Swiss-Prot record:
Keyword list, A-Z: Disulfide bond, Protease inhibitor, Serine protease inhibitor
Species of the source: Hyacinthus orientalis (Common hyacinth)
Tissue: Expressed in bulb (at protein level).
Keyword field contains Disulfide bond: yes
Role description: Serine protease inhibitor. Weakly inhibits trypsin (Ki = 167 nM). Does not inhibit bacterial subtilisin or mamallian chymotrypsin.
Site keyed Reactive bond for trypsin: positions: R14, S15
Similarity comment: family membership: Belongs to the Bowman-Birk serine protease inhibitor family.
Name of the protein this chain belongs to: Bowman-Birk type proteinase inhibitor B1
Disulphide-bridged cysteine pairs: C6-C53, C12-C17, C26-C33, C30-C45
Amino acid sequence: GQQPLCNDCFACARSLCICGDLVPQCHEGCQQCEKVDTGKPLYQCRSFEDYQCAN
């Protein structure tokens, strides 16, 4: 399958993507994203590799 991009994430940490989308999107280097059930669109990056997150 194709890897999603995280163009619409508004905040990222070393292991997390916080996205405004309903679909998990990972920044380049974040190979997999999985939703964390917190009531917010919070996604945890799995198989993390160093990436940059522009504001």
